[in-house]
């Protein structure tokens, strides 16, 4: 996979790297199609994600399964009216549905806004109005869903809230129940251009209100250096990054460069 995007992959010195390392950026690059689906076609049984929790549950997902589930998630989000340019906040802690959701939203050309589960009502209201958030997908924990419920009356752009369970409040969509009954995913004719926004983070707001920091669809390619030359990962490496999915390190530490 790496060779698709980098002409020279090994180097004999720092000078060699500085002189010859170059990322080849495809037109209309989309991490969902050009990396996840490409792996699913080339090596469908290759392990993509090893997920576990503090209850001892353990699931290994192959790239074939990631394609299947991200397509299914994309179709589900399409059924809720999500498409290119729509703002979607993810408050999913370390749930595997985060990987389904972020890749599905990339496939739709939507804008992903990862957020920490520490957000309270005022934090959600501020972010929803600043970014015109259309949908929130959250972990089904009462402390999270309560803050979202309290924020909704002051967040007029939010049309849907989806819970991945186990708790699904009244008025929230049930991800796993509704997800099972969607039609086959139809890939958008033109999901994105390279300079479209794909990922948006809010800063911590240490000297005022949080600021929005946008990344375009080519952003994952920038983390080839992270996965290959900083983390020193190889083809079948197993890598652990301890980061809540609301933080930036979740995507640059356990998704983009690592899967390329």
Where are these regions (language model features)?
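Conserved AMP-binding A3 loop
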Residues: 59-64, 190, 198-222
């Amino acid at each position: 996979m790496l060779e698709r995007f980098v002409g020279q992959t090994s180097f004999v010195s720092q000078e060699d790297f500085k002189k010859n390392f170059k990322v080849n950026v495809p037109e209309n690059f989309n991490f969902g199609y050009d990396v996840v689906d490409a792996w699913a076609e080339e090596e469908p049984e290759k392990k993509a994600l090893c997920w576990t929790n503090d209850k001892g549950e353990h699931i290994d997902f192959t790239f074939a399964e990631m394609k299947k589930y991200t397509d299914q998630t994309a179709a589900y989000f399409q059924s809720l009216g999500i498409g290119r340019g729509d703002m979607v906040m993810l408050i999913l802690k370390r749930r595997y549905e985060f990987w389904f959701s972020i890749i599905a939203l990339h496939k739709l050309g939507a804008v992903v806004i990862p957020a920490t589960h520490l957000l309270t009502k005022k934090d959600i209201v501020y972010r929803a109005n600043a970014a015109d958030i259309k949908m929130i997908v959250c972990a089904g924990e009462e402390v999270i869903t309560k803050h979202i419920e309290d924020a909704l009356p002051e967040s007029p752009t939010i049309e849907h809230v989806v819970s991945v369970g186990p708790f699904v409040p009244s008025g929230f969509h049930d991800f796993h129940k509704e997800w099972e009954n969607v039609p086959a995913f139809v890939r958008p004719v033109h999901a994105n251009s390279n300079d479209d926004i794909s990922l948006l983070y809010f800063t911590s707001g240490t000297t005022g209100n949080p600021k929005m920091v946008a990344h375009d669809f080519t952003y994952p390619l920038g983390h080839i250096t992270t996965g290959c030359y900083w983390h020193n990962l190889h083809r079948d490496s197993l890598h652990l990054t301890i980061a809540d999915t609301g933080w930036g390190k979740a995507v640059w530490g356990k998704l983009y460069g690592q899967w390329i």
